[in-house]
Amino acid sequence: MPELPEVETSRRGIEPHLVGATILHAHIRNGRLRWPVSDEIYRLSDTPVLSVQRRAKYLLLELPDGWIIIHLGMSGSLRILPEALPAEKHDHVDLVMSNGKILRYTDPRRFGAWLWTKELEGHNVLAHLGPEPLSDEFNGEYLQQKCAKKKTAIKPWLMDNKLVVGVGNIYASESLFAAGIHPDRLASSLSTEECDLLARVIKAVLLRSIEQGGTTLKDFPQSDGKPGYFAQELQVYGRKGEPCRVCGTPIVATKHAQRATFYCRHCQK
C-alpha cells in the first residue's frame, strides 16, 4: 500500500503539470472503485487546477468550486503522460489537461477512491485524522501524552491515523528499529526520552524516503513511471532471516492483525 512518502512523491510529481493548467474533461473507464467515482468528476469541463495538496494519504486537487479527493488504495498510482497513450486494463481514470498532458490513474485492485467535495473541512474521510508526522505539532511531548495510558503495542498505535497520519507498516517498522524500540512494547511503557527519539526518527525516516522517491515493493511507481529507491535502504522491513545491518542478528518477522512486523531481537528492546 502506498504510504505517506509515496503519496507525497506523487503530489510533487504531478503538481507542476496540473497547477495553472485546465482540466478539459475527465475520462472515467471504470468508476467502480472503493467508493463510486463522484458524479461531479464525470462532469468536469474547462476547470482550472489551483493547487495540489496532501492530507495524510489523500491527494487534494483544489478547483474553483470544490476539491477532488484521491486515495491510492492498496495498489493505485498516478502517472503524467505526455499524450493520450492507449489505456491498459487497469487504467481507470484520465484527466485530460489543456497543456496536452494526461493524469492517468491506474489501480489493479480498485480499492482507491476519487471523491468530490465542496469543502474539505468536515468531510468524513478527513474529519478524524491526527497531525501530520512532519509538522511541528507531532513531537516527543505530543507522543508521550498520547502514549501515557495506552495499553496497546507501540507499532499498531503508530499506525493509527488518530494518533498520527501516514505512518504505515513499512515506516512504523523502520522507525522503531531506528529508535531501538521493540514493536511489541506497550505504548505506555515508553519513557520521555524514547518518545522524543521516536518522534525525531519518524520524521527523519519519512523525509529520507521522500527524498528517495518512496519505497517501491510491488505496485507503486512514481508519477514519471520510475521506481522509488528507499527500498534499497530498508533496515528491517521485508528482510526476514537476513542479518541485521547493525549487529548481524537475523531479522525476525511476525504478524499482528494480518500485518507483517519486522524487527531485530538484539537491537530493539
From Swiss-Prot:
Keywords: DNA damage, DNA repair, DNA-binding, Glycosidase, Hydrolase, Lyase, Metal-binding, Multifunctional enzyme, Zinc, Zinc-finger. Binds 1 zinc ion per subunit. It catalyses: Hydrolysis of DNA containing ring-opened 7-methylguanine residues, releasing 2,6-diamino-4-hydroxy-5-(N-methyl)formamidopyrimidine; 2'-deoxyribonucleotide-(2'-deoxyribose 5'-phosphate)-2'-deoxyribonucleotide-DNA = a 3'-end 2'-deoxyribonucleotide-(2,3-dehydro-2,3-deoxyribose 5'-phosphate)-DNA + a 5'-end 5'-phospho-2'-deoxyribonucleoside-DNA + H(+). CDD domains: EcFpg-like_N. InterPro entries: DNA_glyclase/AP_lyase_DNA-bd, DNA_glyclase_Znf_dom_DNA_BS, Formamido-pyr_DNA_Glyclase, FPG_cat, MutM-like_N-ter, Ribosomal_uS13-like_H2TH, Znf_DNA_glyclase/AP_lyase, Znf_FPG/IleRS. GO terms for molecular function: 8-oxo-7,8-dihydroguanine DNA N-glycosylase activity; class I DNA-(apurinic or apyrimidinic site) endonuclease activity; damaged DNA binding; zinc ion binding. Pfam families: Fapy_DNA_glyco, H2TH, zf-FPG_IleRS. GO terms for biological process: base-excision repair. Gene3D superfamilies: 1.10.8.50, MutM-like, N-terminal. Belongs to the FPG family. Monomer. This is Formamidopyrimidine-DNA glycosylase. It comes from Salmonella paratyphi C (strain RKS4594).
